[in-house]
Amino acid sequence: GLQLLQYSQADATFTGIEGQVRQRLTRNLGITLFGDTVRAKLNGGGLLPRIPATRAGVRLDANWQAWEGQVEWVQVARQNRVADFETATPGYGMLNLGVSYNGQFSSGTPWQVYLKANNLTDRLAYAHTSFIKTAAPLMGRNITLGVKVAF
C-alpha cells in the first residue's frame, strides 16, 4: 500500500543554529569544526515532519603545491522528535576522505583530478528528511574518481 498524505498550512516556530569555525594550524594544514541543529513545532501543538537531525563534524585539510586533501568525520544524531505519522531515524557517524590535484591547461583553463572515498565505515544511514528514507538509505562505502574542467 501507498501512503496517502494530505498537507495543510499551519503556523509553526522554527529555532536553530548552524556554524563552523576554521583554524589554520600551519601554512598547509587547517582544521574545521562544524554543526547545525533545528527544532520545529506547530504553534497549536505537535511536531513537524522531516526535520533534520542535529549534526556535528570535524574536518582536517591539507594542501601542498597543486595537491589538496581532507579527512572528515560527521556525526548525525538520532532523530526521535517526530510527527505522528513518522518513524524515528537512528544516528550515525561517517568517515570521508578526499584528495585532489589542480592544474591548468596552456589556455589558462583550470582542471582538477580528484579521488573521494565516502562512508568508509560502511554505516547504514538514513536521511530523516527523505520521503523514502527506509526504502533508500544513504549510499554505503563508495569511491569516486573524477575530473573537473571549468569552461
Task: Identify the function of each model-found stretch.
Residues L2-V82:
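Gram-negative outer-membrane beta-barrel transporters
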Residues F14-G16, I51-G57, Y92-N96, I132, ...:
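Transmembrane beta-barrel architecture of outer membranes
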Residues R27-L29, T54-A56, Q65-W67, G93-L95, ...:
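Outer-envelope beta-barrel architecture signal
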Residues L33, L60, G69-V71, L97-V99, ...:
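Membrane-embedded beta-strand positions of outer-membrane beta-barrel proteins
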Residues R81, Y101-F151:
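C-terminal beta-signal and adjacent terminal beta-strands/loops
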